[in-house]
């Protein structure tokens, strides 16, 4: 994935919110832009941005498809910051 500089706040919140529902640290959430209600470019940009900032306990990128694990402490803090500001 190729990241742009400024992902949408709403796109970041959508991905972080979806990942916040993961309780098992071995589970990965396949990111699907249609299921998240995002544009493909918006989802890819936000996912790259969040992965680069270590917002997930783990992630996987295979054949252009991205999956993320539960939120890391950084991810929980970023979600709280984005949702409350």
Residue ranges of model-derived segments:
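Non-catalytic, well-ordered alpha-helical scaffold segments
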Residues: 9-13, 44, 73
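A short, conserved structural fragment
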Residues: 51-62
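Short amphipathic alpha-helical interaction segments
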Residues: 6, 36-53
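Charge-rich, solvent-exposed alpha-helical interaction surfaces
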Residues: 15-18, 46, 78
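Minor-groove-contacting beta-hairpin "wing" of winged helix-turn-helix DNA-binding domains
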Residues: 63-71
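Short, amphipathic alpha-helical interaction segments positioned at domain boundaries
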Residues: 71-85
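A short beta-turn/loop motif at secondary-structure boundaries
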Residues: 35, 62-63
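Short amphipathic alpha-helical interface segments
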Residues: 4-36
């Amino acid at each position: 994935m190729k990241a742009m500089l400024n992902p949408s706040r709403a796109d970041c919140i959508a991905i972080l919110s979806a990942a916040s529902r993961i309780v098992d640290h071995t589970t990965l959430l396949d990111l699907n832009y249609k299921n998240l209600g995002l544009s493909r470019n918006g989802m890819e940009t936000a996912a790259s941005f969040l992965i680069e900032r270590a917002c997930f306990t783990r992630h996987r990128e295979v054949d252009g498809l991205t999956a993320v694990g539960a939120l890391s402490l950084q991810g929980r803090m970023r979600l709280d910051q984005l949702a409350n500001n």
